[in-house]
């Protein structure tokens, strides 16, 4: 999906496919809670040069203020993201956990359980709403969700997202 944003008479095309990278898919992440999952993902992203040293603190702080858990019709997900100053290169990190963890729901901060988190590395704040909308549309599609849940190959998961977003 290519989104178009109009700001001050300029048209900006955003190709979210470029944010996906096969190195940024973790299918067996083991964490007992949200903090442990954040620590593992932040370390991996930092080692690959996608985020800077402040990312873990930034994402943890933002998640406390603005929770990102979403209950969709077919699958509960979370879309954690930090402020842009912690992001070196735009990315989407796909994290599938071994076990569910509790996160707070977007909007009302009620606790919910998720096994799939999508860490969004957004450099331009204007792109945030469009990317969040694209994810919500994907996860309302039962066929896409079924394919994602059943797939265990990173290459095929990468292809699934880049063909559908």
Predicted regions and their residues:
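Cytosolic covalent-transfer regions centered on His/Cys nucleophiles
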Residues: 2-165
């Amino acid at each position: 999906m290519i989104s178009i944003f109009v700001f001050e008479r300029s048209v900006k095309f955003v190709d979210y496919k470029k944010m996906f990278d096969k190195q940024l898919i973790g299918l067996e992440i083991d964490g007992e809670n949200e903090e442990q999952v954040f620590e593992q993902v932040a370390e991996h992203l930092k080692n690959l040069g996608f985020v800077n040293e402040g990312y873990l603190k930034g994402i943890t702080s933002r998640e406390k203020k603005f929770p990102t858990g979403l209950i969709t019709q077919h699958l509960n997900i979370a879309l954690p993201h930090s402020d842009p100053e912690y992001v070196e290169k735009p990315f989407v990190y796909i994290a599938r956990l071994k076990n569910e963890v509790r996160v707070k729901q977007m909007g009302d901060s009620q606790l919910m359980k998720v096994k799939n988190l999508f860490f969004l590395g957004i450099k331009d704040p204007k792109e945030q709403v469009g990317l969040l909308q694209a994810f919500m549309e994907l996860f309302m599609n039962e066929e896409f969700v079924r394919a994602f849940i059943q797939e265990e190959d990173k290459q095929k998961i990468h292809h699934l997202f880049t063909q559908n977003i």
